[in-house]
Amino acid sequence: MSVRTRFAPSPTGYLHIGGVRTALYSWLHARRQGGHFILRIEDTDVERSTPEATVAILEGMAWLGLDWDEGPFYQMRRMDRYREVLAQMLAAGTAYHCYCSREEVEAMREDQRQRGEKPRYDGRCRERTTVPEGVAPVIRFRSPDDGETVVEDLIHGTVRFQNSEMDDLIIARSDGTPTYNFCVVVDDWDMGITHVIRGDDHLNNTPRQMQILQALGARVPVYAHVPMILGPDKQKLSKRHGAVSVLEYREQGFLPDALLNFLVRLGWSHGDQEIFTREEMVEFFRIDAVNKAASAFNPEKLLWINAQHMQRLTPEGLAQHLLPYLNAVGVTEPLLASGPELPAVVALLQERSKTLVEMAAAAEMFYVAPVAGEPKDVEKHLHGQSALLATMTQALGALPNWEAAAIHSVIQELAVTHADGKMGKVAQPLRVAVAGRAVSPPIDATLALLGKEETLARLRRAAAWI
């Protein structure tokens, strides 16, 4: 039987890190087994679901490259199917109408608490023959009274639930709308889901869903409940720990494959390997090797992994990822066309950058000349250096071959003649004059890329800053 997994987010909020890891694990399991990955949007919470959240989920999945084979399916478009199965269960006696009011059920549970019993619905409407007027009933599932429901979870192992402790679950509200646990069961049944991979906050729902599937004569899927992700402070991951939506990581300059690499390692490992290509993740990932303990989100580790992925791309490939971020800082296509080749700039910055945002900020100076230098850097490195700046302009202007090695030789000579052999005393003023700040890639390589004409023009403009 072909493996069929699903990712089923609710569009009540944006796609977050925990949801992405669940989607990734489901996607990897399907891809490794040559199966199918289904996307389902669980939008039955009409009051909280929004079209914007749905769009953000789809955009996030597309950016990450977590492609789906079927879907997206929307629960709100399947209401007729849910009502059909509800009618089927009522006819079979595996579900029944309950006319008890909320107050009646709460009084029942309070009596049970007073007697030291676990509060649960006592099934008084199971065999009810009279129908009260003017009362819209809910529909309850007739749960087994005794025995146990055993979940053989791929991550948590064998988990046992006593049926006597579970009451008759409401599967349709008094207005006729089906509940979450019922819709999920029908969807998984109809879509032939073989493996349900989801957060372990759903583990307690699983025995109820299994019971409904069994009552329908449906095949019960294999379950794998993934532990939650904690913040660096070991508390539940929340917006106070950083980005809320996965798309914020795109805005911050992370590569999609780097983010997936980071997430796959939160609870799973393959020896001591840290960096994985997408193909390696598919090859090595095993859902039953996921740790059942919660993992902590480490922002510094994410930055390190992103830097590793940036370094492993070709300059040409990384340049394509960089383009939107350059546009965001004002480096447009005409500027790119008139400046140095972008892959050459990328190659110079590749070992120094942790994110695409960081790289774009560093690359900007190759295409946009600084209008003025950073005041503190000008004060520290250019103040009183008019003569040195003029000498540098003359020496560099006399260079016949504009190459990094030749530029380096000029800087060395100026250091000997004007700075007691201290390279920094020449390189830093030169850097501030050309880049507008005291931080840049190696200055000789920087000038070589900028070109002779542009370098000399910037040196002359910088003289006005002093």
From Swiss-Prot:
What task does this protein carry out?
Catalyzes the attachment of glutamate to tRNA(Glu) in a two-step reaction: glutamate is first activated by ATP to form Glu-AMP and then transferred to the acceptor end of tRNA(Glu).
Q: Which PROSITE patterns match?
A: AA_TRNA_LIGASE_I (PS00178)
Protein name (Swiss-Prot/TrEMBL): Glutamate--tRNA ligase 1
For this chain, one GO molecular function annotation is: tRNA binding
Judged by the first EC level, this protein's enzyme class is ligase
What's noted on cofactor binding? Binds 1 zinc ion per subunit.
Per its record, the protein catalyses: tRNA(Glu) + L-glutamate + ATP = L-glutamyl-tRNA(Glu) + AMP + diphosphate
Extract the Gene3D superfamilies matched here. 1.10.10.350, HUPs
Lineage, opening ranks: Bacteria, Pseudomonadati, Pseudomonadota, Acidithiobacillia, Acidithiobacillales
**SUBUNIT field:** Monomer.
Q: Where is this gene product found?
A: Cytoplasm
> Quick one: which gene encodes this?
gltX1
Instruction: List GO BP terms, alphabetically.
Output: glutamyl-tRNA aminoacylation
Q: Which InterPro entries match?
A: aa-tRNA-synth_I_cd-bd, aa-tRNA-synth_I_codon-bd_sub2, aa-tRNA-synth_I_CS, aa_tRNA-synth_I_cd-bd_sf, Glu-tRNA-ligase_bac/mito, Glu/Gln-tRNA-synth, Glu/Gln-tRNA-synth_Ib_cat-dom, GluQ/Sye
**Motif range for 'KMSKS' region?**
236-240
**Coiled-coil segments, which residues?**
none
